[in-house]
Amino acid sequence: TNIQFLIQEAKQQILKYYTNYNIAHIIINNYKIDSVDYPYLPDEIMCDFICLDIFFVCLPTDLVLYFKNIFSKSNILVDQIICSSYAKSINYKDNLNLTGYISFIDIGFNKTSIISYYNDKILSLDVLPIGGNHITKDISKILEVNLEKSEQLKHNFDQNLKLSNDKDNSIETLQKIIFARTEEILELCAKSIESNSFILGKSRMVLMGAGSKILDNKHKDKISFPNDIDFLEETTENICQSGFKLSIGLNKNEVVIVPKKQIKLGFFEKLFHFFK
């Protein structure tokens, strides 16, 4: 009961001061019980003092409502919206049995998410306003081609493409553009990791997301960056599996958020309960 009270009190403080955000995940990183740290809550315990380290993952309320409204038009109610970058990182870390300091870099269209861990403890989650689309724009500007052509060149840069009759538009030039912007993204990620996670020096990075598909492990030597980098090949099945495994309790430290009020069932949900 005391644990529930502390979590609820912390949740109310977040909702009070971050009015434009919706709480997607609540993770308990540590239980400090009578000055002793526990990664998990002991089954039986008597104590005089208890303190929780709680990590909140929040999403903009406008974004949550946007997706809920899309499904609502088809009479489908959304019970939960999760942070895909967080869900994927938890799943891949578990599948690959990764330990120590590790950061997952999820490169999207216009944004890049960075989730850092130390073993099973999540240290930070940050979002940078830069992504794969910035590489496309760089190619478009320097090679003077439209965005559609730039996107095509970006995804086929390691093949023997004839860019144009212009001798300056060579494969080498294209690669330099892509690697330069990629190095910038990685450097910004490294700074974020150091400032938010207090990880000094080199740490392992795993790149994922649609924006990272232009690269793979054979290009690692061409990128000037000190950290150990791995490129993760993702499929739609991997992403969906990540969300499913998180929803059934993959992260044992995550708190299950229960709605205060009974939500009105949609048509298909009513049908499901009728035949259940």
Regions found by a protein language model. Give the residues of each.
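Short, charged, surface-exposed secondary-structure boundary motifs
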Residues: 91, 134-138, 236-243
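A polyampholytic, Gly/Pro-enriched intrinsically disordered region
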Residues: 21, 100-107, 147-153, 245-261
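Short, solvent-exposed amphipathic alpha-helical segments in soluble enzyme
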Residues: 72, 97, 220-226
